[in-house]
């Protein structure tokens, strides 16, 4: 709900009171001004503007539409869905504009999941999705993050109701007499427009093979390939409107104007875009099997990722970002009471020289489900679950240079100048920007965790970790 703002008559009365209290001993606004603010007979020289009412609607609409279809049989199953979301803004517009300054956000979603049974033991999964978004608004904002709503909101609240009219009666645009401040109506409706677009397309193809019949029960293999593409771009068509201030009327009753900001008829044009594509490959072999009271599991996984950026400024950012690694896990459980797990990761990063590119990161974990022990049965109706667990391992970080890549290479940049030769011709100088460090490698950290999980009456669960 919008707050109720004072009108010009109330503002002038309170301003006079504050002016007198400051030690001036007289009113800032004379009786003529107070009378005209109260009567509203000359809105050009004595305006009375509720800026919130001039800029904001009483309500805004939003719509959401979803549609989904699913089906299939023994061989193939599918699910397809689409969605549309539209959120209108609270700002008003000028119907005389030849461009759209209205504030709104729109999003379109699409998703398709298809599972195909290629063979009794072979399954193919194809998942596709895409999102498209558009944001529209005023061109008054100077950054790329939004459409000027914060700036307009600010001046709508700090602009006095008697500062100047929304617009003069002869059609001229009003504004402050100094460079400080803005007419919020001009910011909203006369400063051009801004459009921001964002889209993201994702695809994932997976193939799963069950080797339970061919080799041994519990053995499966999985291959995944994903491709993601994201793009963000914006355009701004911006202008500055010609503004005037009114000081008085001449003998014939015409307003005497003082020119404020110099305007322009054309719309400036600026744009920007960024984006990236990511390709990810993963292959894994899984084994899970139970032998009486013993349960064993194992996983071996290979992964590779490449990311390409667009709309970058630095040459090194235009090169692909690449990571590669393998991981493994072995698990064992006895009688659903005692658990042990070992993991390792062997990961490679392009940020380091070939001799330091890969790092090995092991970990181990163990747990005891005390509530599954026979001696726990007498109190199991009170404490139905108690588990003690702990883990220890190493983790690594390859982003140790901030935004810098290829730490093993030095960078050279322009720096200063020097005179050379008999004619003392000036040449540009060079210096090392970032020094090379061929011996740097993964940042390593040791992690330890000990914890307890407990459940009372099958209702209250508490978990504590250190």
PLM regions and their residue ranges:
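Membrane-proximal, glycine/serine-rich, low-complexity loop/turn segments characteristic
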Residues: 1-198, 212, 399-418
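Extracellular/periplasmic, surface-exposed regions of secreted and cell-surface proteins
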Residues: 59, 113-121, 127-132, 141, ...
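Active-site-proximal polar cores
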Residues: 243
């Amino acid at each position: 709900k919008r707050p109720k703002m004072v009108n010009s008559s109330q503002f002038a009365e309170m301003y006079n009171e504050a002016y007198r209290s400051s030690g001036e001993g007289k009113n800032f606004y004379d009786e003529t001004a107070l009378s005209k603010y109260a009567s509203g007979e000359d809105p050009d020289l004595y305006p009375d503007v509720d800026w919130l009412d001039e800029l904001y609607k009483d309500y805004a609409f939003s719509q959401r539409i979803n549609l989904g279809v699913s089906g299939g049989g023994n061989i193939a199953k599918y699910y397809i869905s689409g969605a549309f979301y539209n959120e209108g803004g609270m700002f008003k517009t000028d119907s005389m504009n030849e461009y759209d300054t209205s504030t709104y956000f729109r999003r379109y979603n699409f998703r398709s999941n298809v599972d195909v049974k290629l063979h009794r033991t072979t399954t193919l999964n194809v998942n596709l999705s895409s999102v498209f978004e558009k944001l529209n608004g005023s061109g008054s904002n100077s950054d790329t993050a939004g459409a000027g709503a914060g700036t307009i909101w600010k001046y709508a609240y700090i602009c006095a109701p008697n500062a100047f009219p929304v617009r003069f009666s002869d059609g001229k645009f009003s504004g402050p007499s100094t460079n400080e401040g803005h007419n919020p109506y001009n910011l909203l409706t006369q400063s051009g427009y801004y459009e921001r677009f964002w889209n993201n397309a994702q695809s994932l193809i997976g193939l799963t093979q069950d080797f339970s019949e061919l080799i041994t029960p519990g053995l499966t293999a999985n291959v995944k390939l994903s491709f993601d593409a994201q793009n963000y771009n914006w355009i701004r068509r911006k202008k500055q409107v010609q503004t005037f201030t009114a000081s008085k009327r001449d003998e014939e009753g015409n307003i005497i104007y003082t020119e404020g900001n110099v305007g322009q008829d054309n719309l400036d044009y600026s744009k920007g875009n960024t984006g990236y594509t990511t390709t990810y490959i993963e292959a894994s072999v899984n084994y899970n099997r139970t032998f009486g009271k013993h349960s064993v599991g194992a996983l071996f996984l290979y992964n590779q990722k490449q990311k390409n950026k667009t709309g970058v400024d630095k040459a090194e950012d235009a090169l692909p970002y690449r990571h590669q690694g393998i991981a493994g896990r072995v698990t064992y459980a006895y009688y659903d009471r005692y658990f042990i797990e070992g993991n390792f990761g062997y990961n490679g990063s392009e940020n380091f020289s070939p001799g330091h590119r890969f790092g090995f990161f092991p970990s181990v974990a163990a747990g005891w489900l005390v509530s599954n022990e026979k001696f726990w049965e007498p109190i199991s109706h009170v404490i139905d679950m108690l588990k003690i667990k702990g883990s220890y391992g190493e983790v690594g970080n390859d982003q140790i240079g901030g935004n810098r890549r290829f730490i093993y290479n030095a960078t050279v940049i322009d720096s200063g100048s020097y005179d050379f030769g008999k004619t003392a011709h000036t040449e540009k100088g060079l210096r090392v920007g970032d020094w090379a460090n061929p011996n740097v490698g993964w940042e390593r950290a040791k992690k330890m965790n000990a914890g307890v999980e407990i459940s009372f009456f099958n209702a209250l669960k508490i978990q504590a970790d250190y």
